[in-house]
Amino acid sequence: MASKLNEEAQSEFKEGFALYDGNKDGKLEAAELANTLRWLGQNPSQSEINEILREFGSNNQMGVDGLFNYLGRKVVDDFDEKEIIEAFQVFDKDGKGMIGASDLRHILTNLGERLPEEQVEEMLRQAVGSGDGAINYEPFVRNMLKK
């Protein structure tokens, strides 16, 4: 899951982890995790902290990999399906729910967080087989959000 985070994000998250790992044991306890997440701009409740530790940590502690896994999922979950589909609609010239593979390639490699060419090729292969046809973007978005 850490692969969903770019190197810059991973570096920032490691910095927060190191800053709030008070006893420098490589693990964040509940209070340390809460402070780390607040430093990263989140405001979790105590029950949310407990839930995060249950799901991504062990023995009420979380290592840096657990933090990456949680934040990687959070980054994906923060993108609402409807918002992503609305973004695709900007590139849907005919209003038919389709986008050209070349347009999708351009979006994925040139806008926002640029994806590596290999990852784009795999996504296009899954979406249209040969990678050169039109893509029905609603099912494409749903499929990408499941991963």
Curated annotation (Swiss-Prot):
- PROSITE patterns assigned: EF_HAND_1 (PS00018), EF_HAND_2 (PS50222)
Keyword list, A-Z: Calcium, Cytoplasm, Metal-binding, Motor protein, Myosin, Repeat
The source's domain of life comes to Eukaryota
**One Gene Ontology CC term in the entry:** cytoplasm
Coiled-coil portions: none
GO BP terms: namely: microtubule cytoskeleton organization
Summarize where Ca(2+) binds, as residue positions.
Answer: D21, N23, D25, K27, E32
What molecular function terms (GO) are annotated for this protein? calcium ion binding; enzyme regulator activity; myosin heavy chain binding
Would I find Hydrolase among this entry's keywords? no
The disulfide bonds in this chain are none
PANTHER family per the UniProt record, alphabetical: CALMODULIN LIKE 3, MYOSIN LIGHT CHAIN 1, 3
Q: What does this protein do, in the record's words? A: Functions as the light chain for myosin-D. Has low affinity for calcium.
Q: Subunit notes for this chain? A: Myosin I is a dimer of a heavy and a light chain. Inability to self-assemble into filaments. Interacts with myoD. Does not interact with myoB or myoC.
Name of the protein in question: Myosin-ID light chain
Question: Which species does this protein come from?
Answer: Dictyostelium discoideum (Social amoeba)
Gene name as annotated: mlcD
